[in-house]
Amino acid sequence: MPSHRVRFLGVIMVGLLACAPVAVAATYYVANAGSDDNSGLSPQEAWASLTQVNAHPLAPGDAVLFKRGDAWRGQLVPQSGSEGGGYITYGAYGEGPKPLLLGSIAKDNPDDWAAAGDKLWSAGGVAPADVSGIENLLVNPGFDTDAQGWSSHAEGGAKVAVGREAGGVEGSPGAIRIACEASGSEPHHIQFYTSGFAVERGGMYRLTMAVRASAPFEMYPPVIMKSGAPWTRYAHPRNPHNMPVTAEWAVHTMTFGAVEDAGDGRLNFVLGGCLPAGVTLYLDNIRLERLGAGLIPRDVGNIILNHGPRCGVKVWNREDLDQQDEYWYDEAGFAVYVYSETNPAERYESIECAVRDHIINQQNRHHVCYENLACLYGAAHGVGGGSTHHIVVRGCDFGYIGGGDQMGGDRTVRFGNGVEFWGPAHDCLVERCRFWEVYDAAMTHQSSGGVAAQYNIVYQNNLVWNCEYSFEYWNRPETSTTHHIWFINNTCINAGHGWGHAQRPDPSGRHLCFYTSPAQQSEFYILNNVFYEAKKNAFYAPSWPLEQVKSLVMDHNCWYQAEGTMVAVSEHPFTMAEFAAYRALTGLEPHSIVAAPGLANMDALDFRLTPGSPCIDAGWAVEALYPRPADFTGVPVPQGNAPDIGAYESPASGK
């Protein structure tokens, strides 16, 4: 145990000190009544928009505070702090409820909806005949006769041969050919680009392109940037991800949000390190279009009606719309269609169309703290992005998250987590947060593909209810590593009881969902948690070898699932009544209890422990390993002879 203590103290101190002020730091304020022309340096000089927050350069130690009681729609793209300069904090100021970051488009005005026949109503979009008529901002997009207007660049030992080739996608006259002889090691080592177009701050832009290659690979997403030094990014992609390229022509689409007004835009394909040597890439029909204000630029993954619990039901074809509140997103026309007996906005006072974007996109970010923010109605992740470290998520709310179409096209896979750390991740803390109605997992770290190290990640003192999974984990391949993971003192209620369960192709409902994970694993702690009721399994790891299950450190948890298989591990199912057999097989949880936790009022979302609860003083004194000074509400721990199980600590007289 002493070896754990030395390693873990550093992790927790990161969490405790992450948001401490720095003497030279600046604090910026944001309010609905502010103006982006203001300095932002006082409540009286507050900024107004997320666009300004995302665009303004911040320094390590700075803080951006949103006014309580106000709301913003769109995506927060944080900036990174540094180890020496401190974290950049995104938090709240003033009195009232937490500031809202909404990942949705409101369609609650009857004028938002147009009758489309057969009890169908449409919102957003353009007429199908107009889609192809949107102006293409790029010159020579199809390479019909030559490659004029396009250039290439190679450095860092990379080498490519670029030229036009007759015959492109679907019989078009031509395409561009980029044959790689040496790939280089950094994305900018190979570039293919065009320039000379304008972008407008706050505008939405859609990029489409047809691609194929002589051998499969994953292409980095293109960037929209300044044509010269200092090569500033003019637009941020919404949910950037690598694009799979195969031998067959395929059309890929990306959406960008512009953060600058500029007339010297450059579309840059960065291929160094991803286009393998000996592979030839072909591009055709490259279009960059400014989307109109009325369009819904990304998939609608959920429609929240009157703020829940009722939600729309997603279907994948217009022809399937035949029941009240079913909806379909028209990917080509940027519109949503709803089946309704009457105008939807006359039937419901509030209609929130959750768009497939992370509400907070922290791709490649580090030394960032999010505190006292409410992230609602987003159809991707609440907080998402890969390759992160030194991230703190504290005192935040995440509700009605996920459900968006992950890939688009014919690959109809829905996804969405509350807080996700994807790929390499370390020194991250999620504490005192609330999660409800999440399509996939409330909290997760996961990885697949490249080698990833995931370590020093802590989830503590959180409340979770009505999420498909409370906590999900997997890491692949076997050369990846996972160690020093702590899931402790969380209260997890009713897994699989949320809006998304019945809409899933794989209804699950699990508190702990551990898929196949061959990564090297050690020091994985699951302690002092309440796991109450799950539609299927409170603990699910059927594909894990028994030795991998035994490597977990699990104890002092409270389990209750009245029906069905409560634990499914290593191809062994156990009901609640068979908990002793599970304990004997694995050697885990000698001090865990199997009983109703005795919560105050679950219907009212009051998850405090009642007097006489078996969870009081039944936790492990993890203070021997790390300082956990307080519970979800700040009550000092412990109040009695030992810590309580769950996120709440009862008064000393509670037992």
Task: Annotate each predicted stretch with a short phrase.
Residues 1-12:
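Bacterial N-terminal signal peptides that target proteins for export
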Residues 10-20:
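Bacterial N-terminal signal peptides
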Residues 21-25:
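Sec/Tat signal peptide C-region and signal peptidase I cleavage site
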Residues 27-151, 157, 179-194, 204-208, ...:
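Extracellular polysaccharide-degrading/modifying enzymes targeting complex plant/algal/animal polysaccharides
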Residues 63-67, 89-91, 142, 204-212, ...:
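Residues within well-ordered beta-strands of beta-sheet-rich folds
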Residues 130-292:
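Extracellular and organelle-lumenal recognition/adhesion modules and their flexible linkers in secreted
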Residues 274, 356-361, 376-386, 399-587, ...:
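Glycine- and acidic/polar-rich repeat regions and solenoidal domains
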Residues 286-288, 643-655:
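A recurrent domain-boundary module in secreted/ectodomain proteins
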